[in-house]
């Protein structure tokens, strides 16, 4: 029979360890295969006979090169030789744990050994001989010989995965529901069966309705079911007692589906359902192995990693379900937190980020506005995706205002929707529509609960359940799971539970075995500080000319490949504690380790008493890390090619996920070299990687800073060379080149280039022109010249974008208009690292900083940066004075947010005292890890130029907070922070200082 692997999982018992495969046959039938799960050990071949415990099997690995990867540090160029030996090794498998005196390759997971030992792709398709299987009943079979069973791999075939997407609502009186006294009011399900058929329905708690409401429900013919067996899944809403509702949920969750998907359900929804079921009935959600030998109760287990590096120093905890039935329980919240960098990870913010489109106003009435979205309004195809979400949505966000849906019409290509939008609109206006959660107050709905409220809530709950399905599809989670399992040699059920240091172990183990290499350590891993990538200080604040952006392609992976950086290729590290010894050692290193076979990398010393440090790598025999990286990059290129040639959307999505997974994995290798708990840890390699990266970015800047174009001549600022090794290929390369006359076009004057900023792997190059067509042409020309004439080996750059009206606030903080590099490409406003992208900044601050940046951009485009500052500061002072006197903006515009924590090392630890005072006076306490809002409030009075102890004016703001008559917003704090950011956008420090002293009685803090 032909099988497609869907998920590998283990039993939970300790007596007999089995590994199970959930697979789908070509005819779509579900099949389970069971294998004995062994412990794997690599030992000396001559030591196998000394193992007293019974072994399941042994396999000779043959002679393997055992290499010590301890770091060799010397005071001179006379470096001791690295220990290498060839040993006959053997792989042994046992059903019980062993304790051999000497074990090799012990860092790797048993399940990865299973896949490698039997040459199995966890996500592959295979032709399996039924004669090799023993029938256990219920479509479950036992296999004693996995290698023979999976010997014939066949071309991929696709199947439709079954899934359950759900959301619950619970009655609550305070901020959070209590499982002991708050009932589950609604559970909404979206079920997709293995044939792709979709059902959506909601169960509501009839116990919470009055007799009159139940009579009204009967008149409306809303089904009421007392017994779980009577519940039909074709009704949109069904009323039933809470116990019935919970038992139906239990039945659905115990089904052998491929996926159960929730948003933060592992921590709340699923846990709440099981706890409530246990409390009311004594029953539990239970999972059963396919062979029927083991049944386990639902349980959530937690993995916690404490760190003070995160916001507020709150522990990072992930939640996992202990099921054993082959279903993958997937939490979208944890996945998106791990893979996306967003301002907020609430469902509302994630939905807005994922589902938005441009629409036009078709009709505008006082009570409603009709919007249309299709390919004519949004060419990127967002309208079709938006239409699908609109099918269940009840509210739409229009330019940051949430509007209720009054009427909607949805088809495959687009939609029309009538919204209760109070803004003044005219036919033809273009707006951005976005989806968040429905804008309803659950507290108010529960306080005024009735049948109509219950049905409204059902629509709200169903939309949240369907949002899980929409986000699942949007992020391509299914294909990402499959790609990760195949890449990392891990079961699908755990690929996103592990960190990169564990995920890399499967590919690393496979590569080591293929190259017959074993890496061993005797010393304790030691890690010292080392410098990261080079981030240049901005040379000026505002740029009225175009800036070309050039990025190195995969800089760190290519550094590792070029310099052959790997723990076993490290010849040694030469350190010196005085200048004389350092100079002598440098001469000896060049003589004893000549290029190009060796590369000597000067690095920053590892301790203050040293003055020099040089790491030497042998480039002759390829190292494990470069080979690993090359395999990832080659695999990525292969899947990108397959993606372009794919005939179906499903195949295209699968290959796209594969190439993306290999890209992420390759980029993570550098970080793992510097991570002490990683199997790839190599302090010298990680430090050398960043040192070479800094050299390469400085080389590119040196070559381009001062270059120019005049007619058909391109003059580089310096003649190209190889900054890492003496390279004969660069002999005679000139700094001047002939280029295509079409690049300059009609221009006859000389156009110069100036480096204005650089960050790790990118260079910002200002071009002395403001013609976007010319900037694009010259950028593409420079990309070709750099790659063909300036760079070498595997180093390449990419012309990424043209920035117009660039405003550099400081390192890693800028705002600009970004133009695509292709002719006719569009543009967008981009802010990186600024207050506009932070969620702990007041909306007033964001509004004003965006307004003044736009004003700066317009001024730069019209008149340059000469007299911009005067107009900016004059306008700013007028606006702030007006707001202070008129107080036109509500308190909401001045709210800040912060996560409550107890990290006393944090500079904002006074939040503990603030929250303690609030909790003492309020029933709804702020809990550790919870985000709360606060504002600066003071007594009514005139403007205060000097303020002491700013934090003493903080007040927690909840839904009941109101300003007293003798209180006001402390505008001085907000205005000072805003003005500090704005003056840092301007070049005239003297003028900014005078402005600041006049308003606030102090000098501003200027950042780099």
Swiss-Prot record:
Its EC number is 2.7.7.7. Pfam families: DNA_pol_B, DNA_pol_B_3, DNA_pol_B_exo1, DNAP_B_exo_N. Keywords: DNA replication, DNA-binding, DNA-directed DNA polymerase, Nucleotidyltransferase, Transferase, Viral DNA replication. GO terms for biological process: DNA-templated DNA replication; viral DNA genome replication. SUPFAM superfamilies: DNA/RNA polymerases, Ribonuclease H-like. Gene3D superfamilies: Helix hairpin bin, Palm domain of DNA polymerase, Ribonuclease H-like superfamily/Ribonuclease H. It catalyses: DNA(n) + a 2'-deoxyribonucleoside 5'-triphosphate = DNA(n+1) + diphosphate. GO terms for molecular function: DNA binding; DNA-directed DNA polymerase activity; nucleotide binding. InterPro entries: DNA-dir_DNA_pol_B (IPR006172), DNA-dir_DNA_pol_B_CS (IPR017964), DNA-dir_DNA_pol_B_exonuc (IPR006133), DNA-dir_DNA_pol_B_multi_dom (IPR006134), DNA-dir_DNA_pol_B_vir_insert (IPR013617), DNA/RNA_pol_sf (IPR043502), DNA_pol_palm_dom_sf (IPR023211), DNA_pol_type-B (IPR050240). Belongs to the DNA polymerase type-B family. Interacts with A20. Component of the Uracil-DNA glycosylase(UDG)-A20-polymerase complex; A20 and UDG form a heterodimeric processivity factor that associates with E9 to form the processive polymerase holoenzyme. Catalyzes DNA synthesis. Acquires processivity by associating with a heterodimeric processivity factor comprised of the viral A20 and D4 proteins, thereby forming the DNA polymerase holoenzyme. Displays 3'- to 5' exonuclease activity. Might participate in viral DNA recombination. Does not perform translesion synthesis across an abasic site. This is DNA polymerase. It comes from Orf virus (strain NZ2) (OV NZ-2). The gene is POL.
